[in-house]
Amino acid sequence: MSLKPPVSEKDHLQGDKNAPIELVEYGDYQCPHCGRAYPIIKSIQKKLGNKLKFVFRNFPLAESHPDAVNAAIATEAAAVQGKFWEMHDAVFEHQRDLSDAALIKCAQKVGLDISKFESDFDKQEIQDKVESDLESGVRSGVNGTPSFFINGKKYNDSWDEDTLLEYLRSISV
């Protein structure tokens, strides 16, 4: 399966936008597997440096993870203030409690204007961004989280750090 749509300016991107390796994760902030993948991706980003661009797309599995949608909306609301990645990290680092009160604490921790955050949280376009990510995942063949795409193609191998890093290094040569 291929990534639909391809990465664009609408995505949240870390790293060099012209990097030779593009890693896209469809993730759910409440998913324990995504929680385990989070430090692995951070480590891989450090090891590959400017050879890697990383994109995160929301894929909340609401039936299994009742707080996942609100957590995704919270990160998108933080993006309005230019703090998507800070909120992304804070939410994963506090994954055990994603209640509304906990999300407000995360927003405070990353220095958001809380009244603006709360206002943006309720905006339809923020909810639409989460829904758009989810729909793109469905079109791309995502059926669980985390799901990874490397240079536009679905990655189906193990995502333990050694295996994923070895694969990424093999394609960057």
Tell me the role of every PLM-derived stretch:
Residues 24, 29-109, 169:
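Structural alpha/beta surface segment adjacent to cysteine/selenocysteine redox centers
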